[in-house]
Structures are given as C-alpha cells and as structure tokens.
UniProtKB/Swiss-Prot annotation:
Biochemical pathway: Lipid metabolism; fatty acid metabolism
Annotated signal peptide: none
KO phenotype (gene knockout): No visible phenotype.
UniProt: Fe cation 2 binding residues: 178, 231, 264, 267
Coarse class of the protein's main subcellular location: plastid
Keyword ATP-binding in annotation: no
Name the record gives this protein: Stearoyl-[acyl-carrier-protein] 9-desaturase 4, chloroplastic
Tissue specificity statement from the Swiss-Prot or TrEMBL entry: Preferentially expressed in roots.
Organelle transit peptide: 1-44
Amino acid sequence: MALLLNSTMTVAMKQNPATAVSFMQTTCLGSSFSPPRHLQVSCVATNPSKTFRPIKEVSNQVTHTITQEKLEIFKSMENWAQENLLSYLKPVETSWQPQDFLPETKDEDRFYEQVKELRDRTKEIPDDYFVVLVGDMITEEALPTYQTVMNTLDGAKDETGVSLTPWAVWLRAWTAEENRHGDLLNKYLYLSGRVDTRHVEKTIQYLIGSGMDTKYENNPYNGYIYTSFQERATFISHANTAKLATTYGDTTLAKICGTIAADEKRHEMAYTRIVEKLFEIDPDGTVQALASMMRKRITMPAQLMHDGRDDNLFDHYAAVAQRIGVYTATDYAGILEFLLRRWEVEKLGMGLSGEGRRAQDYLCTLPQRIRRLEERADDRVKRASKSKPSVSFSWIYGREVEL
C-alpha cells in the first residue's frame, strides 16, 4: 500500500500538484478531514522564485571579504572568547521562561480567570502601541534568520552543529536565550485578543522566508559591529515599550518588556566587548570596518518585513514606533555616539594607517551629520504634510493607525 501510494503521489505531483495535495488529504488523513477554508485552495506556489523572494530588491551582495591576515587575527581571539565571552550567558536552570509571565494552565478555572485579567489590562491600550509591539515581536520571531546569518561569519562558524569552539557555543546559547523573547510576546499578544494572529503569523513566515540583508560580507569584524549596534537598538526599543506599558497600566506587560530589554542589554555588552577586543589588537582594521558598516548604513533586521498586502510594512511600523517614541531616528545617532565612546574611537592614535585615520575622522563627525539630516527631513515632512497620514495594519484587523 505504501509503495502504491508513493508511486501514485509521484505521478500526481508531476501532473497536477494541487490534485496531489487534495489526494493526500483524502487518502492519508481520511475523507472526513476538512482543512480551514483558506487552505482548501492549492497550497503549492505557482511561481516559487517570485513568491519567496524578498519584497524589496536586494543588490550588491558581496561575500568573503576578510583577508587571510585579518582572519588569523580573529582566530587568535579564541582563548580570549572562551574566558571572557561565555560568562555573559546565563545557566538555563536560573533563567526566566515565558511561562513565568503567562496564565497558569494547570488549574482550568484559574487559567480562564487570569486570561480575563490579561484581557482587561490590555483592552484600553491604544492600537498604535500594539502595532509597535507586534512589529517588535515579529522581529524577535525571525530568530532562525539571525542564527543562519551569524553562522556565515568566517572564523566564527559552528562547522558541525555541535562545535565546542567558544564562537559556536556562544551562538547556540545566545539563540536559545533570544528564542524566549518572541515566544513570550507572541503568546501574550495572542491571549490579549487585540491582534489578528493569522496575519501576524503570515508576516513572520514571510520575513523568515525573505531573509536578511546585513552586508556582513561573511566578515566577523562587520558581523560583531552590526550585532553590537542591533542589540543596543533592541534594548532601547523594549525598554521604551516597557515604559509605555506602565503608563497604560499593564504592569505585567511592562515587566515582560523590561525583562527582554535586560537580556538585550547583556547581549549588547557581550558583542561590544568582542569589538573592543578587536580594537585592542587591530585598531586600524576595526576602525575601517566600522566606517564601512556605517557608510553602508546599518539597518534594522526586519527591513524585509511583509504581510502579503503592504509592500512598505516595515516603513509604516517604523514610522509608528518613531511617533510614539519607542525607537526614533535620534536613537540611531545616539547608538553610534554610545559605541564611539565605548570603543574610544576618538582616542585612537598610534597604529592607524592613512585610511584608518580617514575612517576615524569620518566616524567622529558622523553623529552630528546624521542629526542635521534628521532635522532637515523632519522639517520637510512637517511642511509637506499638514494632514496626518494613517495606514491600515492587517495585524490589528485592518484598523488604521496614524503614522
């Protein structure tokens, strides 16, 4: 029977994939199986290359730019990483878990009571906050992409999947810690009843399928500079959603966002420590790498966000985050200033080449230039738009939110 079924399925898939899906549902799952209405149409993509490509054009993809000399410098840090990097990880047994913040499922009556309390706390929170919180959660849920991309860094890869190099151990454990963030926010949002879960889930699938344009070039110098910046950005974002949740009266949600922010801060400390060490042993190469990443402009990891409807979903989500003060253009310049101070870029002297000194000069004046550009852009927006534009978000059942 199995052989006959496999043979029949093979022929059917070649002739008509949609028929094969229907045949499998009837034969393998029973004739009484009735999938949800939106799944009754063929689930086989008619044009996979178009369906699963990023919503925005990704160009100028460059790979493996690190020189052998720089690679050897990075590899020389392995003992240092073993002694200094892994200490930023927390033991699993003493780590918080999502269930610590969610309704208890063991007691049915208590569960329903706690869900009602959760819904009562969240029912008056404005839609714009939920748009930003959902966007933050979706960003966290794209964790498979981040681990995949980090595992492309030359000299820092987990070559076997169970490698015991400090870089591999860190990457797996960092991923495990980060995994709790999306899990917790996703469950809380689901229980709140305030969001259209299916459209949120579609966005997550689209985002993971689209990938991420980091411009790392497989270079660990670039990779750890990027993660230093991004962990700082996510720390700021989650800390601000925590403050707003307190303002709106949901102390549990505030604690959730604050706990996630604390994780991001610890991870920021780890990644900035790696780059600090790179500055110590190779200041010229590291300052040039930092300048290169800033010239390419470090972008948020969810830039390719899409829900199947809004081609500019990330920009709209980011605009709402800017308006309510969760993550702003001013924060971008502030993060750069913070990192330049942290790595003492202005104090670099001996050991810099001519190109290194030019990179240093560029970086030290960049925050001020970014702020000036932001001010001009804000002025143009204010002059051009007397009315307040709004956009419909599928995440909140198509309701409109001001940008």
